[in-house]
Amino acid sequence: MLKEAHIEFSQKRRFYTNELKGKSKILVALHGYGQLAQFFSRKFAALDQAYGLIMPEGPHRFYLEGSSGRVGASWMTKEWREQDIEENTRYLLALIEKVKAENAAASIYLLGFSQGGATAARLYQSSPDLFETLILWASVFPPDVTVQDFDQAGTLHFAIGNQDPYFLEAQKEDVLQTYRNLGFKIHEFEGKHDIDPTTLSKILQ
């Protein structure tokens, strides 16, 4: 009879960054499902001079179509989900604590896009004092994170496009009300399921 077993070992995780030294603000941005950090980072190119940028990559990489071609990554699936959540949080905390130790005066802004939003919310929940601001973008708020977890939260923002195909109008209103109840400032922009540079700039002002 076979039974599930586990083993622990050290491993590397990949992230992308620009020059952090001398930057007073650092943006950590978590990509969505099926994206790679390298290409997701292009959406933030306009911030390269003013902000330190850190783009972690989800641990699960896969072919987007069939068994070859373009590759994407995700933060988790439904399989062994709780363990992935725990390991993602440990990985991201280790990364951010290292960055903070090397850039003690910098303020850290955390953004999660789409699937990365749930990972960002859990990370913020675990150590809210590390972050100046939490920005969740086109993401459903994770049900395992409660209102009480954000009682002492800093600045909270939620952004969504008015033509986002993943949020039908009725569902979108429910999502927006959830974020309002949590104390998030709502930003709706003209667009679909994507990062809008103008809206992002307004949030970061």
Which role fits each region the language model picked out?
Residues 129-141:
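A conserved short beta-strand
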Residues 157-164:
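Short beta-strand/loop motif that positions the catalytic acidic residue
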Residues 32, 114, 138:
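Catalytic nucleophile serine of serine hydrolases
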Residues 42, 122-126:
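Active-site signature of alpha/beta-hydrolase-fold catalytic machinery across serine-
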Residues 5-20, 24-103:
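Serine-hydrolase catalytic machinery in alpha/beta-hydrolase-like enzymes
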Residues 111-116, 120:
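Gly/Ala-rich beta-loop-alpha elbow adjacent to hydrolase catalytic centers
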